[in-house]
Regions:
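Conserved beta-strand scaffold positions in the cores of enzyme catalytic domains, especially
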Residues: 102-104, 117-119, 217-219, 255
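Glycine-rich, phosphate-binding/catalytic loops in enzymes
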Residues: 33-34, 95-98, 120, 171
């Protein structure tokens, strides 16, 4: 942590990076760190390979740039926030790796130490580290920053339902509420809102899931044609649909989503099972009960490979 604080204090111009397929933790943590550093008088820009309108209600989300041609050598320091693997920087990867002064702030202990400097602590969310950094920098957290950090923590803890939720998480969130975090806005705008098209697509996916009662797992699939047929808004996320089957008693549930660059897979598991071990088979990872990976195969092939990997894992424990 001392080295991290030193780097952030010394740099005058800083570029922050979130991971591709952005989630609440990478977005909330990155934007919160941006605001903290700007309070110190730093010039800060934020980058991500892609954006998602689902986060547009956040007041400073429009600060993100997707310009992968940006000249990153002009910055004193590049910081990857909640990015466990350099490939999740996408088009920014090579420029990041070639920069002389880089920092990775992360809570994925199974990630890669690809930056020149790495701080990685096993916390419920990367936002916990950003909160601690703000304290070390002696920067007062305002209501907007508190809302961003609260949003980030809610995302990675599943609104405090996931097994990574601990007493530290609750203590920090209590502090964030005292600082003015708008928990009602976070819950209403991000976790509650939906559309009829999304509900129809979700129903289709759930009803056509492949269940295996012998080993206790489920694999769901969504094809490009499913997206075209039901046409949900781009900002709606189906990655948490597997939780529905966990609530029915299944041990592990997976959803495989057909995209242009391959099959994006989201894994969820009950507390006592480690779905990250399955995701790791395909070069992915994440958390014990919530992980992901990208498979370069057809949708049918990916579903078959996932089923085999899940069965192999469940047989081994």
């Amino acid at each position: 942590m001392k080295q991290t604080i030193k780097l952030l204090k010394q740099a005058k111009t800083i570029a922050l990076f979130s991971h591709t397929s952005p989630d609440p933790d990478t977005v909330g943590s990155t934007l919160a760190l941006m605001k903290i550093l700007e309070k110190m008088g730093k010039k800060v820009d934020v980058f991500c390979a892609e954006t998602n309108d689902k986060f547009a209600y956040l007041e400073c989300y429009d600060r993100y740039s997707t310009d992968e041609t940006a000249v990153l050598n002009n910055y004193d320091l590049l910081v990857a926030v909640d990015v466990p693997d350099q490939t999740m920087l996408c088009g920014f990867e090579q420029a990041f790796l070639s920069h002389k002064n880089t920092l990775r702030i992360d809570h994925h202990t199974k990630g890669n130490d690809y930056a020149r400097h790495n701080i990685c602590e096993n916390q419920s969310a990367c936002a916990v580290l950003i909160f601690e950094i703000a304290k070390k920098l002696k920067v007062k957290i305002d209501s907007e920053t508190a809302t961003l950090l609260y949003f980030a923590i809610c995302g990675d803890t599943g609104i405090f339902k996931n097994s990574n939720t601990d007493s530290v998480t609750f203590r920090i969130c209590a502090d964030l509420l005292d600082f003015g975090a708008d928990f009602k806005k976070v819950y209403t705008e991000f976790f509650l809102k939906s559309t009829l098209e999304y509900i129809k697509l979700s129903s289709h996916i759930l009803l056509n899931a492949k269940t295996n009662d012998e080993y206790g797992y489920v694999v769901m699939r969504v094809s490009k044609s499913d997206y075209d047929k039901y046409n949900p808004e781009q900002n709606e996320n189906i990655s948490n649909l597997p939780n529905t089957y966990l609530n029915c008693g299944y041990k592990i549930a997976v959803i495989a989503k057909e995209k242009e660059d391959g099959i994006h897979c989201s894994f969820r598991s009950k507390f006592e099972y480690d779905c990250s071990a399955v995701a790791a088979v395909f070069g992915g990872g994440g958390h014990k009960n919530a992980s992901g990976c990208l498979i370069d195969a057809s949708l049918d092939e990916a579903v078959s490979q996932i089923s085999n990997a899940v069965e192999t894992y469940l047989k081994s424990i």
